[in-house]
């Protein structure tokens, strides 16, 4: 296969278009940049559509090994010039390899409490970085996955992908409406712990967590509405001792998830 030298090459244009959410949604594909992330995609047997690489930008054996492994697995690999590759890359000083990966489509109907015993549900998150960081924490504590409720954020936004540090390839992400999720979770027997400044119990005071369970966190700005809080079996609070009135969403999720892990172990 000859080296791609033109910025207007159809394959390059299609890949570049994936910077836009509209194109990611229409195609079901997203871009993955960074050697570690691409290595995780390969390790997780993610559905990699293709790889673009620029030999002039590659300066590590690991990068060359990734390309060799991808080729051995039958993944189409396009060699490009450095200039063409840089038109694809978002990061400064790119490492010379970008993957086009197919999004993993998972719905609530695909999940059962047996194989999804404890997860996180986020109501209307706004920041893709928070979504990626929470997914990374889900991975770290060995939880089951992430549900995005009434969400406008794209979990395949480059910021979310980077913040997940590869966890996006290992754990399911489901998008649903709040009402759809609540109507599904209750019959499945999930115990729902909601985080709220009005919670009746400090998170540290819970001696045991019921399973299967969800940790439900409200939006960065509004928290849980009264209607959303009413769905919870228990509202828990994180103490605020100083002037801050709340924690960053990803930080709050991390605090609660590690508390759950400690009790479950």
What are these regions, as identified by a protein language model?
Residues 34, 127-134, 247-252:
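Amphipathic alpha-helical repeat scaffolds
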């Amino acid at each position: 296969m000859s080296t791609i030298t033109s910025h207007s090459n159809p394959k390059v244009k299609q890949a570049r278009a994936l910077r836009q959410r509209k194109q990611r949604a229409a195609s079901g594909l997203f871009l993955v940049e960074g050697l570690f992330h691409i290595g995780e995609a390969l390790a997780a047997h993610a559905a990699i559509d293709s790889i673009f690489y620029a030999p002039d930008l590659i300066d590590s054996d690991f990068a060359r090994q990734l390309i060799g492994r991808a080729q051995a697995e039958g993944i189409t690999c396009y060699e490009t010039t450095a200039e063409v590759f840089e038109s694809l890359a978002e990061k400064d000083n790119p490492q010379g390899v970008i993957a086009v990966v197919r999004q993993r489509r998972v719905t609530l109907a695909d999940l059962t409490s047996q194989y999804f015993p404890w997860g996180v549900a986020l109501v209307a998150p706004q920041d893709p970085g928070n979504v990626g960081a929470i997914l990374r924490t889900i991975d770290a504590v060995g939880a089951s996955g992430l549900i995005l409720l009434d969400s406008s954020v794209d979990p395949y936004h480059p910021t979310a992908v980077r913040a997940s540090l590869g966890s996006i390839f290992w754990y399911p992400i489901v998008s649903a409406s709040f009402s759809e999720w609540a109507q599904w979770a209750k019959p499945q027997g999930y115990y729902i712990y909601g985080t709220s400044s009005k919670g009746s119990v400090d998170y540290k005071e819970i001696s045991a967590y019921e399973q299967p369970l969800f940790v439900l966190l409200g939006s960065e700005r509004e928290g849980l509405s009264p209607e959303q809080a009413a769905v919870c079996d228990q509202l828990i609070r994180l103490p605020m001792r100083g002037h801050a009135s709340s924690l960053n969403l990803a930080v709050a999720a991390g605090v609660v998830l590690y508390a759950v892990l400690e009790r479950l172990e």
